[in-house]
Amino acid sequence: MTQHESANSQPSAFSLTFGDNGVAWLKIDVPNERMNTLQSAFVDQVTDVLAQLKDKKDIKGMVVYSGKPDNFIAGADIRMLAACQTADEAQQLAAKGQELFGQLEALPFHVVAAIHGPCLGGGLELALACHSRVCSDDDKTRLGLPEVQLGLLPGSGGTQRLPRLIGVANALDMILTGKQLRAKKAKNLGLVEEAVPLSILLDIAEKQALKGKPKRKGSFQEWAMGGNALGRSVVFDQAAKKTHEKTRGNYPAADAILDVIKYGLQHGMKKGLDQEAKRFGELVMTSESAALRSIFFATTAMKKESGSDALPATIKKVGVLGGGLMGGGISHVTATKAGYPVRIKDISNDGIKNALVYNFKLLDKQRKRRIISKAELQNKMFSITGGTTFTGFTNVDVVIEAVFEDINLKHQMVKDIEQQTSDYTIFASNTSSLPIHQIAAAAERPENVVGLHYFSPVEKMPLVEVIPHQGTENGSATSEQTIATVVALAKKQGKTPIVVADKAGFYVNRILAPYMNEAAAVLLSGEPIEHIDRSLLDFGFPVGPITLLDEVGVDIGAKISPILLAELGERFKAPDVFDLLLSDDRKGRKSGKGFYLYNTKKKEVDKSVYKLLSLEPEQKAAGQDIALRCTLMMLNEAARCLDEGVIKSARDGDIGAIFGIGFPPFLGGPFRYMDTLGAKRVVEMLKDHTDKYGGRFTPCDKLVAMANEEQSFYS
């Protein structure tokens, strides 16, 4: 393949070369950027490049490919949206993207997208405007339209081209969830024609380009969804119902996606594109999209932070103490995501067996879904070993402790690890309630001791709290290198770490406890369990507080509550339900007995719990009032945490609440939500609730001062 570079005096993201066989090559390589992202300025660049093609009469086809080693196009640069002052301006941005891809689609010869790495958002919309697509079968390759996760819809033709390519039902599933497809799945759906090894990707794309333009394949499904009003109605009704169950009306982008796809099928491509751009512009201006985009920018910024000025130490092997649910999950993300060999220590062979079985089941699910091969499963399992002694711990660099919440046991673990490992081995405790400085009190090298608080289930929950201590009576504080090392480890495990202060409850449990306590107080006032849960689900939480108590375990709540009460005062006093529940062996799901019935087909409240608590349930309060009552406790405590230095910033507090608890993402986190309400309004509501329910609602000094000064958490 001989290529001749075209003259181009301006630095452009798009460059053309021509092969002797009639194939043109359009390379996308955004200057000075690690990833290709699309920008509005590219419309003129593409127009210039396509103008060069008009002078060439012998072109038989064209391959569009990336000049970056590991990504096609990661999406549009969403920083452009922040500059939009009106919906019309945002609509024009979408229209520009549509124009750019329309020019590509209108070319008279066969245009093939050769995709390797992430092909997301505007990147996939560009690929959809090509006449064919081939992709590498590499694990790095992902195809998707994740705009809904930013409170948006695909605005450059995605809502119109994707349903016409893979059918309405599949397109709705992709666009409404924002899911990213691996190569094999993309091929099965017909999103790409071929999924091939990277080494031959461009050769296969070239052969495709030399063939004539493909004719669109009709299918019964396409006819039913595009031309049959009844069939179309059924699919959209089902999608709308399923979507509303998830979003509960809190995400306007989901409704807009359904409307725009339906409109395009009814009125044709041109009108569909116009409607897509219009609704895109409207969504950019919503508070929900602004909040979701703020989360995206926050997490992007946090990926570049190390939590410390020091460089992280090199990690080659990790030890895990405890083979329970947490230990099993921690070993899983350490071995399979971070890629480190893991040695597990437990007091019994059953504990080791449980951890290994837990890992096998998670990996076998991936094998069954053909995400990994049998050989890959075996290799990953080989990297996780265990035993009842400290054999294999001599050369570990980090030990993550996940044993029972008992200070004496944790002290023994610290001593054992210091005896069995090197002077540099880090001891990271997964405690959810015990102060790290108390654990470090037993250490000869307290500078190596740090908190590393994961959330259950570890393999799913994205947050981890990193808790350095400020020193013991006889020793120094957690070292900067220790902090940097565990932050780096957490990132490799696929987690978003936030560094929080060593104070009771740390951050997440501290803001969660008053919220949960208030939900229990609402229950004791006689409100039905399902009404309380439904109220918070409607507000936007992923699970209701009573369900959450069942899932976490009533015994865990009972253990943490006294610690918070002793350290933080009466506002953390839990309602008198824990002892009653535990006396009846109601620990929640783990004991098969809690607020809800288990081992039943349908989720139902265990009505015998009302008798145990001497309650006659009756729905009196409005759902919105219950949601506000519980959430205000969380907001007030979050503001206190920032004021006391438990968290470093409002941004960290928002990410911690969203990723650790599931605070409604469309509200942007507790601090952004308080900014939306205004500090003055928050204080007024807290005072109103103080009058109704007692002193625990007294607004904290930070909020009162902010209300008086008309300040906000974000400038």
Curated annotation (Swiss-Prot):
Protein name listed in UniProt: Fatty acid oxidation complex subunit alpha
A single Gene Ontology CC term: cytoplasm
A GO molecular-function descriptor: long-chain-3-hydroxyacyl-CoA dehydrogenase activity
NCBIfam families with a match to the protein in the record: FadJ, PRK11154.1
General function of this protein: Catalyzes the formation of a hydroxyacyl-CoA by addition of water on enoyl-CoA. Also exhibits 3-hydroxyacyl-CoA epimerase and 3-hydroxyacyl-CoA dehydrogenase activities.
Family: In the N-terminal section; belongs to the enoyl-CoA hydratase/isomerase family. In the central section; belongs to the 3-hydroxyacyl-CoA dehydrogenase family.
Region (Enoyl-CoA hydratase) location: 8-197
Keyword annotations from UniProtKB, A to Z: Cytoplasm, Fatty acid metabolism, Isomerase, Lipid degradation, Lipid metabolism, Lyase, Multifunctional enzyme, NAD, Oxidoreductase
Site label Important for catalytic activity, positions: E125, E147
Superkingdom to which the source organism belongs: Bacteria
Main location: cytoplasm
Region (3-hydroxyacyl-CoA dehydrogenase): 313-715
GO biological process, one term: fatty acid beta-oxidation
Catalytic activity, EC: 4.2.1.17, 5.1.2.3, 1.1.1.35
Quaternary structure annotation from Swiss-Prot or TrEMBL: Heterotetramer of two alpha chains (FadJ) and two beta chains (FadI).
Localization terms from the record: Cytoplasm
Record Pfam families: 3HCDH, 3HCDH_N, ECH_1
Catalyzed reactions: a (3S)-3-hydroxyacyl-CoA = a (2E)-enoyl-CoA + H2O; a 4-saturated-(3S)-3-hydroxyacyl-CoA = a (3E)-enoyl-CoA + H2O; a (3S)-3-hydroxyacyl-CoA + NAD(+) = a 3-oxoacyl-CoA + NADH + H(+); (3S)-3-hydroxybutanoyl-CoA = (3R)-3-hydroxybutanoyl-CoA
Signal peptide range in chain numbering: none
Originating organism: Photobacterium profundum (strain SS9)
